[in-house]
A protein has these predicted regions:
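Short linear, low-complexity motifs centered on an aromatic residue
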Residues: 1-2, 19
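Hydrophobic h-region of N-terminal signal peptides that target proteins for export
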Residues: 9-18
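Acidic, metal/ion-coordinating pockets
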Residues: 20-270
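Sec-dependent signal peptide recognition
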Residues: 2-9
Length: 270
């Protein structure tokens, strides 16, 4: 498996001077129901759920489960016969088995409609976050999907905001027309970043995004209070962290892992 191993040193001001590793962020995106190793192409024999699980377990065993944050940036559904046959239920079982800490929605999560997605979301044990669409009229909004969440790992209080691509372009009209936006992308990120940073006193604020790589880069320039953007949707493999300057002049890193689970992102925070 190609593993994307990246290190962010002194990501937060409170960490400057710390010598011990505080946190490992493991992240994937756009796995698209690829549960088996690839059968063709240059990645033949690589990938698959077993290989991903083995790597995740190895990191947890090495640094301690309480120091690992496992994220998925959306589109865990659609892309192999497993989804066609089981309708996304198998992916939910595996998300729970791997013990993800947080996920955001991708557009392909809506392929069987918003009600069916709501049924599956309720089966996911980890928080599912999406801030730029309003699901309050649906059962999944009342009992499942929230704009953001707070997770404690490695002695840190971590706020995570979810973002979803423009569904009017990539989801059926029947579904997309029923789901109102909660504001512009920049508006909702600024709102929830302020809430997490100032009201909830989070040490680290992450945007878990399914907007696309270029959109993530642009988003940073219109927002404040965000420390890291973990992205998906465009299937972009980012070898090195790309930085953009936010409204306060801070350099914010943006990352994405390609697709199909062939790359696993790792960010070490000290």
């Amino acid at each position: 498996m190609k593993r994307l191993l990246l290190t962010i040193v002194c990501l937060l001001a409170v960490m400057v001077g710390a010598s011990a590793q505080r946190l490992v962020i493991i992240h994937v995106n756009d796995t698209h129901s690829h549960l088996d190793p690839e059968r063709t192409g240059e990645d033949v024999g690589h990938g698959g759920i077993i290989e991903r699980a083995a790597y995740i377990d190895s990191v947890r065993n090495a640094v301690g489960k309480d120091k690992v944050l496992l994220l998925h940036a959306g589109d865990w559904n659609q892309g192999s016969p497993y989804y066609s046959i089981f309708g996304g239920d198998l992916e939910v079982s595996l998300i729970n088995a791997l013990k993800y800490d947080c996920l955001t929605l991708g557009n392909h999560e809506f392929d069987n409609g918003v009600e069916d997605l709501g049924r599956r979301v309720k089966g996911i044990k980890a928080p599912v976050v999406c801030a730029n669409y309003d699901f309050s009229q649906f059962d999944m909004g009342r009992r499942g999907v929230k704009p953001c969440t707070i997770i404690r790992r490695g002695g840190l209080k971590i706020g995570i905001i979810g973002m979803l691509t423009d569904i009017t372009k990539v989801v059926s009209y029947e579904t997309a027309s029923r789901i109102p936006r909660a504001g512009t992308d920049a508006e909702v990120v600024n709102k929830w970043a302020d809430y997490l940073r100032n009201d909830k006193k989070c040490d680290l604020v992450i945007v878990l995004s399914h907007l696309g790589y270029d959109e993530d880069l642009d988003l940073v320039k219109e927002t404040r209070g965000v420390d890291l953007v973990v992205g998906g949707h465009s299937h972009t493999f980012v070898k090195d962290l790309e930085y953009r300057t936010d409204l306060e002049g801070k350099q914010v890193p943006v990352i994405q892992d390609g697709c199909w689970g062939l790359n696993i992102g790792r960010i070490d925070v000290y």
